[in-house]
Protein backbone atom coordinates (compact mmCIF):
# COMPACT_ATOMS: atom_id res chain seq x y z
CA UNK A 1 0.00 0.00 0.00
CA UNK A 2 1.39 3.37 -1.03
CA UNK A 3 1.24 6.17 1.55
CA UNK A 4 -0.24 9.47 0.47
CA UNK A 5 1.55 12.81 0.92
CA UNK A 6 -0.02 13.61 4.30
CA UNK A 7 0.78 10.16 5.70
CA UNK A 8 4.40 10.44 4.57
CA UNK A 9 4.59 13.87 6.19
CA UNK A 10 3.14 12.61 9.47
CA UNK A 11 5.53 9.66 9.67
CA UNK A 12 8.48 11.94 8.93
CA UNK A 13 7.39 14.34 11.69
CA UNK A 14 6.92 11.50 14.19
CA UNK A 15 10.27 9.93 13.30
CA UNK A 16 11.89 13.30 13.93
CA UNK A 17 10.10 13.87 17.24
CA UNK A 18 10.68 10.41 18.69
CA UNK A 19 14.31 10.15 17.60
CA UNK A 20 15.13 13.83 18.21
CA UNK A 21 16.53 14.24 14.72
CA UNK A 22 15.73 16.87 12.07
CA UNK A 23 12.94 16.13 9.58
CA UNK A 24 13.87 15.25 6.02
CA UNK A 25 13.17 18.71 4.57
CA UNK A 26 12.88 17.49 0.97
CA UNK A 27 9.52 15.89 1.76
CA UNK A 28 8.11 19.27 2.80
CA UNK A 29 9.06 21.35 -0.25
CA UNK A 30 5.99 22.67 -2.09
CA UNK A 31 3.44 21.10 0.27
CA UNK A 32 -0.11 22.34 -0.29
CA UNK A 33 -2.37 23.72 2.41
CA UNK A 34 -4.66 20.72 1.89
CA UNK A 35 -1.78 18.29 2.53
CA UNK A 36 -0.91 20.15 5.74
CA UNK A 37 -4.56 20.13 6.84
CA UNK A 38 -4.83 16.40 6.12
CA UNK A 39 -1.60 15.77 8.01
CA UNK A 40 -2.95 17.68 11.01
CA UNK A 41 -6.30 15.84 10.84
CA UNK A 42 -4.54 12.47 10.68
CA UNK A 43 -2.27 13.41 13.61
CA UNK A 44 -5.33 14.36 15.69
CA UNK A 45 -7.18 11.16 14.75
CA UNK A 46 -4.17 9.04 15.72
CA UNK A 47 -3.51 10.87 18.99
CA UNK A 48 -0.05 12.06 17.95
CA UNK A 49 -0.75 15.71 17.19
CA UNK A 50 1.66 17.09 19.81
CA UNK A 51 4.42 14.71 18.73
CA UNK A 52 3.96 15.80 15.12
CA UNK A 53 4.25 19.40 16.35
CA UNK A 54 7.65 18.55 17.81
CA UNK A 55 8.74 17.36 14.38
CA UNK A 56 7.47 20.57 12.77
CA UNK A 57 9.72 22.55 15.10
CA UNK A 58 12.78 21.01 13.39
CA UNK A 59 11.69 22.25 9.94
CA UNK A 60 12.95 25.54 8.54
CA UNK A 61 10.24 28.19 8.98
CA UNK A 62 9.64 28.40 5.23
CA UNK A 63 8.66 24.69 5.16
CA UNK A 64 6.35 24.78 8.18
CA UNK A 65 2.54 24.88 7.88
CA UNK A 66 0.75 28.12 6.99
CA UNK A 67 0.35 30.55 9.89
CA UNK A 68 -3.36 29.93 10.63
CA UNK A 69 -2.91 26.15 10.83
CA UNK A 70 0.31 26.57 12.78
CA UNK A 71 -1.48 28.74 15.38
CA UNK A 72 -4.32 26.20 15.76
CA UNK A 73 -1.77 23.41 16.10
CA UNK A 74 0.20 25.34 18.73
CA UNK A 75 -2.96 26.06 20.76
CA UNK A 76 -3.97 22.40 20.63
CA UNK A 77 -0.50 21.39 21.87
CA UNK A 78 -0.84 23.87 24.72
CA UNK A 79 -4.13 22.19 25.67
CA UNK A 80 -2.37 18.78 25.66
CA UNK A 81 0.22 20.18 28.04
CA UNK A 82 -2.42 21.57 30.40
CA UNK A 83 -4.26 18.25 30.45
CA UNK A 84 -0.98 16.42 31.12
CA UNK A 85 -0.27 18.66 34.12
CA UNK A 86 -3.81 18.03 35.38
CA UNK A 87 -3.31 14.26 35.04
CA UNK A 88 0.00 14.43 36.92
CA UNK A 89 -1.60 16.48 39.71
CA UNK A 90 -4.56 14.07 39.93
CA UNK A 91 -2.27 11.03 40.01
CA UNK A 92 -0.22 12.55 42.84
CA UNK A 93 -3.36 13.40 44.83
CA UNK A 94 -4.91 9.98 44.25
CA UNK A 95 -1.72 8.15 45.22
CA UNK A 96 -1.38 10.23 48.40
CA UNK A 97 -5.03 9.62 49.26
CA UNK A 98 -4.73 5.85 48.84
CA UNK A 99 -1.46 5.83 50.80
CA UNK A 100 -3.27 7.30 53.81
CA UNK A 101 -5.52 4.23 53.64
CA UNK A 102 -2.60 1.78 53.43
CA UNK A 103 -2.98 1.19 49.70
CA UNK A 104 -0.07 1.48 47.30
CA UNK A 105 -0.66 2.52 43.70
CA UNK A 106 1.31 1.76 40.57
CA UNK A 107 0.54 3.80 37.51
CA UNK A 108 0.03 1.83 34.32
CA UNK A 109 0.18 2.94 30.68
CA UNK A 110 -0.70 6.47 29.61
CA UNK A 111 0.93 9.22 31.60
CA UNK A 112 3.27 6.71 33.22
CA UNK A 113 4.78 5.81 29.86
CA UNK A 114 5.07 9.44 28.86
CA UNK A 115 8.33 9.75 30.79
CA UNK A 116 9.97 7.75 27.98
CA UNK A 117 9.05 10.40 25.40
CA UNK A 118 11.39 13.31 24.58
CA UNK A 119 8.67 15.73 25.78
CA UNK A 120 6.47 13.76 28.22
CA UNK A 121 3.55 16.21 28.04
CA UNK A 122 3.27 15.56 24.29
CA UNK A 123 2.18 11.95 24.70
CA UNK A 124 -1.59 11.88 24.54
CA UNK A 125 -3.42 10.12 27.33
CA UNK A 126 -7.13 9.70 27.75
CA UNK A 127 -7.43 8.43 31.29
CA UNK A 128 -5.49 7.33 34.35
CA UNK A 129 -4.90 3.62 34.91
CA UNK A 130 -3.57 2.43 38.25
CA UNK A 131 -2.95 -0.90 39.95
CA UNK A 132 -3.55 -0.98 43.70
CA UNK A 133 -2.21 -3.33 46.33
CA UNK A 134 -1.72 -3.53 50.05
CA UNK A 135 1.23 -4.88 52.04
CA UNK A 136 -1.40 -6.45 54.29
CA UNK A 137 -2.39 -9.49 52.21
CA UNK A 138 -5.45 -10.08 54.39
CA UNK A 139 -7.02 -6.94 52.90
CA UNK A 140 -8.67 -6.79 49.53
CA UNK A 141 -6.97 -3.61 48.32
CA UNK A 142 -8.79 -3.55 44.99
CA UNK A 143 -12.22 -3.68 46.64
CA UNK A 144 -11.16 -1.08 49.21
CA UNK A 145 -9.68 1.15 46.50
CA UNK A 146 -12.91 0.90 44.49
CA UNK A 147 -15.00 1.73 47.55
CA UNK A 148 -12.82 4.76 48.30
CA UNK A 149 -12.95 5.88 44.65
CA UNK A 150 -16.75 5.67 44.75
CA UNK A 151 -16.70 7.78 47.91
CA UNK A 152 -14.48 10.39 46.27
CA UNK A 153 -16.70 10.41 43.19
CA UNK A 154 -19.86 10.98 45.19
CA UNK A 155 -18.21 13.74 47.24
CA UNK A 156 -16.96 15.37 44.04
CA UNK A 157 -20.46 15.29 42.54
CA UNK A 158 -21.93 16.91 45.67
CA UNK A 159 -19.33 19.69 45.48
CA UNK A 160 -20.35 20.51 41.91
CA UNK A 161 -24.06 20.82 42.75
Where are each of the predicted segments found?
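Conserved catalytic core of two-metal-ion nucleotidyltransferases
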Residues: 83, 91-93, 149-160
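Conserved short internal alpha-helix adjacent to the catalytic or cofactor-binding core
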Residues: 13-14, 158
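Short amphipathic alpha-helical surface micro-motifs
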Residues: 34, 112-114, 153
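Non-catalytic regulatory/linker segments of enzymes
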Residues: 2-3, 82, 142-146, 156-158
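Helical scaffold of the NTase/Pol beta-like nucleotidyltransferase catalytic core
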Residues: 2-8, 19-109
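Active-site nucleotide-donor binding segment shared across nucleotidyl transfer reactions
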Residues: 90-149
